[in-house]
């Protein structure tokens, strides 16, 4: 069986085809970074319009890359939420239209379930159950995963997501958009220990997180110490250390509370090398395992949507004729399959 996956929840247009025997047959991705750079962030209306321009050509390119036609596709999966409603509607409408025109099942996929399952595309894939740390520009959450669709939310950010905090702090430091990866590169030049940032919400029980205060702390530190190149690098180092330490502390707690020893880390921030190194040390100390998607599947992409769609199609889960777009959609409301 083969599923075409469509991802348009924010500022990447991602298209992929997944074969349940051969894996990913094609993977097309277009990023809108240049489009939004002048504005310092994603402009929803511009994002939607660009998805309108790019989605169908990328679907055609994915079919050509795989050497397939419409008759070779068994289902069409699309991101139905959460995300920017206009952007979601573009992919959802195109996906549903193709499904009706080609007489194929349409599968609405939860964007964060796509991220959560992305490590399943790797040769070394995790087995259920496990704890998942989902960290991106829009979400930071810890989830107990007992199976596909069987999710228990353990904790989440009560304000900014980790990726959002990276981008906002980078903007404060005068870095270009998107600033998160640039801040991490700058942090590599920094001196550990010159500045010490708080580890928010680690001094109390629970698995919820908070990152907005780190942005304010960074602004105050810059104001008090100047912004020469080395100072900026040292502040970036302190900021990244605080975020990574906080995530690692929360992961340790989640694993202890659940009694599990497998950790999945996914979402855009999961590509952060410092985070990967620290979580690898954590899991080694716990005699457990940690799993990530490859870097190209950390950010938004169609491959994760095609894979998640395939699992639901195999379970007989597909959509009625109405187009489904859900801007706010808690992950733990999905039904197990």
Swiss-Prot record:
- What cofactor does its activity depend on? Fe(2+)
Cellular component per GO, a single term: cytoplasm
Tell whether Cytoplasm is among the UniProt keywords.
yes
Record: residues binding Fe cation? 111, 115, 300
Task: Cite the EC number.
Answer: 2.3.1.234
* Record's cofactor remark: Binds 1 Fe(2+) ion per subunit.
Q: Which InterPro entries match?
A: ATPase_NBD (IPR043129), Gcp-like_dom (IPR000905), KAE1/TsaD (IPR017861), Peptidase_M22_CS (IPR017860), TsaD (IPR022450)
Q: Entry's PROSITE patterns?
A: GLYCOPROTEASE (PS01016)
Pfam families cross-referenced by the UniProt entry: TsaD
Catalyzed chemical reaction(s): L-threonylcarbamoyladenylate + adenosine(37) in tRNA = N(6)-L-threonylcarbamoyladenosine(37) in tRNA + AMP + H(+)
Q: Coiled-coil stretches, from where to where?
A: none
| Positions contributing to substrate binding | 134-138, 167, 180, 272
Any one GO molecular-function label of the UniProt entry: N(6)-L-threonylcarbamoyladenine synthase activity
Localization, UniProt: Cytoplasm
- Enzyme class (EC, first level): transferase
- Could you tell me the superkingdom of the organism this chain comes from? Bacteria
Q: One biological-process term from Gene Ontology? A: tRNA threonylcarbamoyladenosine modification
Instruction: Cite the NCBIfam families for this sequence.
Output: gcp_kae1, T6A_TsaD_YgjD
- Name the protein family: Belongs to the KAE1 / TsaD family.
What role does this protein play? Answer: Required for the formation of a threonylcarbamoyl group on adenosine at position 37 (t(6)A37) in tRNAs that read codons beginning with adenine. Is involved in the transfer of the threonylcarbamoyl moiety of threonylcarbamoyl-AMP (TC-AMP) to the N6 group of A37, together with TsaE and TsaB. TsaD likely plays a direct catalytic role in this reaction.
User: What protein am I looking at?
Assistant: tRNA N6-adenosine threonylcarbamoyltransferase
Organism per entry: Aeromonas hydrophila subsp. hydrophila (strain ATCC 7966 / DSM 30187 / BCRC 13018 / CCUG 14551 / JCM 1027 / KCTC 2358 / NCIMB 9240 / NCTC 8049)
